[in-house]
């Protein structure tokens, strides 16, 4: 799990340093700790927006797929995670980013990674995700207390930060299915230690063409989290309590993904697996957005200068 957040922080850091380089004519990628090159070996850093960003497995499989294909598959056939073959640049002046709404920043960030989505497709996904389901128009406001700024990520439907990505993943996935001519019903398998399960079910509830099955450790979540999951409405939502811990649930889900015989049987029955866990690039890319938005908000409010480093 830590590697997923490391990836997000590295990409966010590169975005900020790229904007600094545009303004000053220089940047220092070595200051990104632990560093793009060290954290993502074999991944190139692009200094201009690429025409297309493809994805490959972290296990070295040479095959590449488009963003929409990576979102649909969730996990590579060799069991690795999908990562971009190059990191795109957020080549938008900070003064413009600072004046944008959350939805507009989301488009600028996500369009760099999800390059096979059209502008209309991506903007439609964003509009349907970040709407009245959030109890504030800012979506992710910044507040200050005792000299520390707090990025509020609890304004979504389930009051968990997972809502930030899981509100848009169903829309990305159904759009990806249409783009790739997928006729099968998509079965989302998700392991959770609490928050992800409820947020994922809330996001996918009654979404046409999908079903979602959440596995959680029977004695590893709080009573409130369990009640949230087992009372979730939706004709396509299912939840299963297992004997074991979260790692057991996650391992079982990955084994099902890697069972090619099971995949073939499902295909014959008109189904295919995908994931709503953070192994899916459709979860990771939306999570980059709120870091960029937070930084731009600090610049907008005059709290920091463009290019100034911050602790996150």
Where are these regions (language model features)?
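Short, basic/polar N-terminal leader/transit segment immediately after the initiator methionine
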Residues: 3-4, 22, 31, 53-56
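PLP-dependent amino-acid enzyme catalytic core
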Residues: 46-312
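Hydrophobic alpha-helical signal peptides and transmembrane signal-/tail-anchor segments
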Residues: 1-17
